Amino acid sequence: MKKTALYNKHVELGAKMVPFAGFDMPVQYAGVTEEHFAVREKAGMFDVSHMGQFIIEGPGAKDLLQYVTTNDLNTLTDGKAQYSCLPNGQGGIVDDLIIYKMADEVYFVVVNASNIEKDWNHISKFNEKFGAKMTNISDETSLIAIQGPLATQILQKLTSTNLSEIPYYHFTIGTVDGVQDVIISNTGYTGSGGFEIYFKNENAEQLWNALTEAGKEEGLVPCGLAARDTLRLEKGFCLYGNDIDDSTSPLEAGLGWITKLGKGDFVDAEFFKKQKEEGVSRKLVGFELLDKGVPRHDYPVVDAEGNVIGKVTSGTSSPMKKIGLGLAYVKTEFSKPESAIFIQIRNKNIPAKVVKTPFV
């Protein structure tokens, strides 16, 4: 089991540790609900160093990434980041990822922890044609996400970089608490604003401690993966392995906005064009339960007659809305907001309705 550079810190803070994507990770500290509300109302701090990072550079870098991802790299300028996904050649998704343009011909790519090796092999296979230089820096890179309405003012205490000048999905390289060459990125997976900072492992404890100290007055709390999941779900963000995977297309998953069919040739471009013309037979939708219950991954979705029309991909009891809600693939005819559906929970069909995301 791998450990992040902050493992000892989590143990010292009394975090409950669980195996996740080959890492021993903190699932919670004080408690999921408390951590969730801290991020929505004040600020929370997450160790997400298990994520993967690649540097892809050189004359072939842009063409390689433009070919293996769905989004359009032509819209990326230095200091800008882009959400995208890797199609698998059969219309499914290898992974979703964020691409940071560091400079001309230099890209920093962030992938999901569970897919580091898979993504590396997938991109490498196509790189035989493009000849870009690829470096996997996952093992020496740490990542802290500081999220919530007060996150920016906490981080600002530790850096001379003017954070208010970094728009959403933009980044800069700066100094934080004296640590140089930190990637300071206005991104996150909570929908509550804030930053993600990338740096070398040896600076992890220093920066964690500095943030803890800087955020005392604002009520900053350490948060685990469980709160990260309830936070992202309330915003309707996809989780790889649940809501998207090798069997789901970006168009089915509501990721048409990052699938730029007019950008030129790329993996599965023809498949997606055809799928767009013909329409998809199922769609990923948000739903809310109308009765008590907690929907979970893989629970069947049925219609009024009890016919299976889909399945739940992610579900929870929402701390903010105090109801069961989630994401599910349903037959397209049931995908319109307000459509009546039922979630099968312990052999009971619980009434639910399709809603637009975000939920909060």
Task: Identify what each model region corresponds to.
Residues 59, 112-117, 149-152, 200-205, ...:
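Helix N-cap motif at beta-to-alpha junctions
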Residues 100, 105-108, 112, 117, ...:
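Well-ordered alpha/beta subsegment
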Residues 1-84, 92-94, 226:
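Acidic, proline/glycine-enriched N-terminal capping motif
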Residues 64-65, 119-123, 154-155, 207-211, ...:
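Hydrophobic side chains in well-ordered alpha-helices
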